[in-house]
Amino acid sequence: YDEFWKNPGANIEEYIDDYPDIPIFMLTSWYGHHVWATTTKLIEFKKRLKSPIKIIIGTWLHGYETLLDPYSGEVSFGQNSILHNIEDLRLKWFDQFLKEIDTNVLDGPIAKIFVMGTGETKRDVNGSLIHGGYWRNSEVWPIEGTNFESYYLNLNGLLNTIKPDSLEPPTQFTFDPNNPVPTLGGCIQPPKVGGIVSGGAFDQ
């Protein structure tokens, strides 16, 4: 870490106090690579700013064209997960604060998030796993009922909530950039790299 990385785009912690006190509308997703930074900003902005703040968290991949997709990777979240009115929301936001027109865009709680799950354990006609989910509104972040849990990788390759004994021998592997371990799913930028890998949820 040196001067090259010391900028607002790469290190929000050092520059969070430099943000102007203006209305902020944030849009991110569970499979977008900015979700951690965006929710961290939400927490810190609420401590510092008096202007209105709103956030929407969906299921799409990183990229505007995926906002109308009901799936990410090989998982389908249903038609209800699609954010149809994003342009309408943006126009309402700008009209509210640039034209001083009351658009009701500030009505409702701070956060609107898509809670993934509650779907069936089968696949649809396109072969996507039906995972389902629903939209939830919240005035607080993290949302009420959130439980933070630490998971640890054990010798058998499984995750466990019990921290391994420090006396256990570590698991080691050799990293060879000429023969890398394949990447499948998750938060990838851009979501489709030359048709080689795709972001989202996959059965691995």
Segments the model singles out, each with a brief description of its role:
Residues 72-204:
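C-terminal, loop-rich substrate-recognition/catalytic regions characterized by aromatic stacking residues
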Residues 1-105:
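Active-site-proximal cap/loop segments of hydrolase catalytic domains
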